[in-house]
Amino acid sequence: PGKRIIGERAFDGAPGLRLALALPPIEVAVTARLTDGDTVEFEIPVPDVEAAFVLKMLARTVRDSERDLQDIETLLEIVASQPDYHASPWRLGDPKITKAGERGDAARVAAQMISSPPTRVPARVRALLRRHVAIVSR
């Protein structure tokens, strides 16, 4: 875990990537305008909300980024809004699911965040974690 330097580039470890690649993605249609004015249209797969959440939660085990915390809050707000466009259902609220594996690892990070002081994790994020992630005691 942590940053690795390969060549002249720094890379963070990517715990949770296996889950993100295993779950069905959300297909996003993109129309990009090029600098010459032409447009290119394509579809790109992005991780589903749950897979992205697990990635971001597990990223906190190797780095402490304000951006990751903002992304976690955004993903939880999406879950709270109950959108129809999930590629797969949100399962992190089920204690049977959060007992093991990458989802379990993410739930353990959530438990740490919930018990963090408000100066580290905002109250809204802690409330959303309590509401949407089943914390299983070991």
Question: How does the language model describe each region?
Answer:
Residues 1-138:
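Compositionally biased terminal segments of proteins
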